[in-house]
A protein has these predicted regions:
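Structured loop/turn residues at beta-strand edges in well-structured enzyme cores
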Residues: 29, 51, 63
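Non-catalytic, surface beta->alpha helical segment in thiol-disulfide oxidoreductase systems
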Residues: 57-85
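Conserved redox-active cysteine motifs that mediate thiol-disulfide chemistry
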Residues: 6-19
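Structural micro-motif
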Residues: 47-57
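Preference for well-ordered, secondary-structure-rich cores of eukaryotic proteins
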Residues: 1-2, 61
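Thiol-based oxidoreductase modules, predominantly thioredoxin-like and allied folds used
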Residues: 5-6, 21, 25, 29-43
Length: 85
């Protein structure tokens, strides 16, 4: 599975979620992780992130299976990831 994170430096929720993103990487080391800056990375646009950041998109075989939008607590985030395992 692949997790794509789209965030921005001006987004407070993105900064808060950055710590949880690092924890995801530690707890799910077999996933592929990609990060894009909403303002700087043109590649982010292919995922159509919308206007609410951060966005974490979970892909399986290059198909989106889950989209997590906005700031989440650690338990909420891990629950959403666990649901697709």
């Amino acid at each position: 599975m692949k997790l794509v994170r789209i965030s921005s430096t001006w987004c407070v929720s993105c900064i808060v979620m950055g710590k949880l993103w690092r924890e995801l990487k530690e707890n799910y080391p077999d996933f592929e992780y990609v990060e894009y800056d909403y303002d700087l990375d043109e590649e982010a646009k292919i995922y159509e992130p919308g206007k609410i950041l951060p966005v974490i998109i979970i892909l399986k075989d290059d198909k989106e299976i889950k989209r997590i939008v906005g700031e989440k607590s650690k338990s909420e985030l891990f629950k959403e990831v666990d649901e697709v395992l």
